[in-house]
Amino acid sequence: MANLVKEANEQLKEVIMKAMGMAVADGKFEPVPLPPFTIEIPNDKSHGDFAANVAMVCAKALKMNPRQIATILMERMIFDGTYFERCEMAGPGFLNF
């Protein structure tokens, strides 16, 4: 089970980083160094199987509202070949998968 969780976490990190790269290429994000973000399993299952705080921790570096960052990322996420089908935004900018 631990290997499955680790693999899913790595898949999400890759999906997010590719979406970030696409957003930079599209001119939506500035190409600036970004702080580390976390992907975790939420205690409340209504928050999805996994949650990422990437939009909130990158808000200062990107000089954007976290919800705007989350929206831009969600529009560019490709889940082909992963365990995941979709992403939803919650609260101040969490990405729930």
Regions found by a protein language model. Give the residues of each.
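N-terminal alpha-helical targeting/anchoring segments
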Residues: 1-96
